[in-house]
């Protein structure tokens, strides 16, 4: 999920709300990474070097789980981040497991 640091859900930071939702739903692993720079579409590149980027710096939320679990949580994530980019990829777990 590609979010902005200023995005909110019920007056709380969206990335934290997404992580809380995923935790509550028992998703295996999730993380939010604050980017130092980025852009979306035709918008300007925003960087962390700007004193006040106006909440436009990217925050990327990534999570890992089975297809079935992703299918179950995805509708709510689409609602929470209706205005943002959500990307889905199939991955191969090289080490560890989802137990």
What does each model-identified segment do?
Residues 1-99:
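Positively charged, small/polar-rich N-terminal and surface patches that mediate targeting and assembly
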């Amino acid at each position: 999920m590609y979010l902005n640091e200023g995005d909110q859900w019920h007056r709380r930071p969206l990335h934290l709300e997404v992580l809380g939702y995923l935790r509550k739903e028992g998703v295996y692993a999730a993380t939010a990474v604050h980017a130092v720079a980025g852009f979306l579409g035709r918008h300007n590149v925003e960087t962390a070097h700007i004193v006040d980027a106006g909440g436009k710096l990217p925050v990327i939320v990534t999570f890992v789980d089975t297809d079935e679990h992703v299918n179950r949580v995805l509708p709510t994530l689409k609602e929470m981040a209706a205005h943002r980019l959500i990307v889905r990829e199939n991955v191969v777990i090289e080490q560890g497991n989802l137990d």
